[in-house]
Regions:
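Substrate-binding N-lobe of the ribokinase-like
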Residues: 2-73, 80-87
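Ribokinase/PfkB-type carbohydrate-kinase core domain
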Residues: 43-46, 50-55, 70-212
Length: 212
């Protein structure tokens, strides 16, 4: 919910949408409630031409209240115990996983054990050569060290911003390292193929083994 009204969003859905814009066969996987907002969401997805797998569950469709400060920096009020906290691992979701070449997920959807276990099952069902992109996307206090660590072990591409990198450095016990060395340390420790660091107005950096 933005100041100007309702807008469909979320990092993984945005990823799926932009992948589709490049002509790739992309699917957004989540869950919707049994309510009017879910119907509106489906309508928007279909209008945008975005494929989706979003089972209906007996929880309200998820919403986020977004407020922008004078510089346009957002703050988020993320409603809890909603549909996407309870994504079921259905046969359809499993079939999608088994045919996936790239998957993107974040930390927020893992705040509840139901969706967290579905994400793990999805990742376990993907082909061995699947690109697994963890967009860490820390929000409020909806994350733990264990959840972050588990996803970093399961991904081969990590996307993180400079503020999140500071938090991760503190969390994992290397706060004194500079930004570049933190990235190299994470890249090697988790045997990543790529680490993408975004720095807001200062641009982005891509780290791969032996190269930045």
């Amino acid at each position: 919910m933005l100041p100007e009204g309702k807008k469909l969003g979320g990092a993984p859905a945005n990823f799926a949408f932009h992948a589709g814009q490049f002509g790739l066969n992309s699917i957004a996987v989540s869950a919707l409630g049994e309510d009017k907002l879910a119907d509106e969401t489906v309508q928007q997805l279909e209008e945008k031409g975005l494929q989706y797998c979003m089972p209906r569950v007996p929880y309200p469709t998820g919403t986020v209240q977004v407020k922008l400060d004078d510089e346009g920096i957002p703050t988020y009020d993320i409603k809890e115990n909603v549909a996407w906290d309870n994504i079921p691992f259905t046969d359809e979701v499993k079939a999608i996983a088994e045919n996936t070449k790239a998957v993107c997920w974040g930390s927020l959807a893992q705040r509840n054990v139901v969706s967290r276990e579905t994400i793990y099952k999805f990742l376990d069902a993907t082909p061995a050569d699947c690109m697994k992109i963890f967009d860490i996307n820390l929000r409020q206090d909806f994350y733990t060290k264990d959840v972050i660590c588990e996803s970093m072990k399961r991904c081969n591409v990590l996307k993180i911003n400079d503020e999140e990198l500071v938090l991760i450095g503190r969390m994992f016990g290397y706060p004194g390292l500079d930004i570049e060395n933190k990235c190299w340390l994470i890249l090697g420790k988790y045997d990543l193929d790529m680490l993408v660091l975004t720095c807001s107005v200062n641009g982005s950096y891509v780290f791969t083994p032996g190269e930045m």
